Curated annotation (Swiss-Prot):
Protein name: Tryptophan biosynthesis protein TrpCF
Catalytically driven reaction(s): N-(5-phospho-beta-D-ribosyl)anthranilate = 1-(2-carboxyphenylamino)-1-deoxy-D-ribulose 5-phosphate; 1-(2-carboxyphenylamino)-1-deoxy-D-ribulose 5-phosphate + H(+) = (1S,2R)-1-C-(indol-3-yl)glycerol 3-phosphate + CO2 + H2O
Chain intervals for the UniProt region annotation (Indole-3-glycerol phosphate synthase): 1-253
InterPro entries (alphabetical): Aldolase_TIM, Indole-3-glycerol_P_synth, Indole-3-glycerol_P_synth_dom, Indole-3-GlycerolPSynthase_CS, PRAI_dom, RibuloseP-bd_barrel
Pfam families: IGPS (PF00218), PRAI (PF00697)
Amino acid sequence: MPSVLENILKDKLLEVAVLKKNHALPINIAPSDRDFKKALLEKKTSFILEYKKASPSKGLIRKDFDLLEITKTYEKFASCVSVLADSKYFLGSYENIKIVSQHSTKPILCKDFIIDAFQIKLARVMGSNAVLLMLSVLDDKNYLELFNLAKSLNMSVLTEVSNQQEIERLLKLQYDIIGINNRDLHTLKTDIFHTLELRPLLPKDAIIISESGIYSHAQIKALAPCVNGFLVGSSLMKEKDLKKACIKLILGENKVCGLTRIKDAKAVYKNHFIYGGLIFEKSSPRYIKPKEALKITKAVKKLDFVGVFVKDKIKKIAKIAKKLDLKAVQLYGYSQKEIAQLKKSLPKTCAIWQVVSVADSKDLAPKTKEASLILYDTKGDKMGGNGVSFDWEILENAKTPFMLAGGLNLDNIQKALKIKALGLDFNSGLEISPGIKNKDKIKQLARILREY
């Protein structure tokens, strides 16, 4: 039985014939005017974000495939973008490259199974600045011909390898940027550790992109030290809220707690934090009345709000969660039985964060089945936050996912980022005074979170 790749290549011959029939190329093709390679090197870790409507492994991924709306989001987060041009298996087109090039400022990769010089010329005419060449598809002679054609048009080339044999071939040829595909193109299975296996076989100074199977910030942080960037498509395209998906993937699921002002909540959202925390414990200096909290949640609807409760009645928690449309409740001092009871009363859209207060490793506790994650905070006199940190090294073997809280600030953020937390929970470290956030510190923190 032919593999998926073999079927694609068989159909690609027919597709290229149709492209040649439908598109007349100009005699002189303008060279690329956007530097794809340079854009990849502007940050320690770069992101090629992809426009992908469908794929052979997943079928239709994004029904509402609005190129302009996708572009608006990718402009904020992408180093470069990738546009699928394959029509049969990915529902892409070369016309999509033209549309994206007219509305995006980012260098564009033409993503296709390129077997013919016509595809590269057409991609350039449509506005592409780089092409993908796959050693699983091309022999050495054809690869070099296509590589040299692309370079003559001032285009970058992303050469894809997927195994040791292809790397051995590549090292005898020319290359520009190297992509390690984590997907087996014959079975369509993915394994992100494929990048870790193949990276040592490539030159240390090579520009390396990890492709396929990237779904989480944890995967990004695990692979980032050994590559220059990532090509990501399916994991973003499947999400309705594309901006939030980009933030979670690139920055993680971070939170600023103790919000008491609308303008602080707006600053938190603007700087790409996922969560804003509202403290409903009256003994806290950051306590906020539910009616005041409602004003904030209504004013900044796209920020996911988390309510912090300390030994409050279940009925009261459920009422506030519904009224404010909380995305999670953060619980201090509740038994497993109480958490189970609360789960029944909460809206389905509201998760439970089980707080575990920590002084030493003996305090680490398993998550109850009703909770979506554990939040580790410092054990102290006050439940609901003490503004001091604990020895984070004891979390080295903690089960994920978990959030980390307790005395986080700009001075210890680098150490905190080494902990494998789903996200970090900031509060007093970003304040002018209790409940009053410092927008400059929020901005500075956002920059640090992206510096990897």
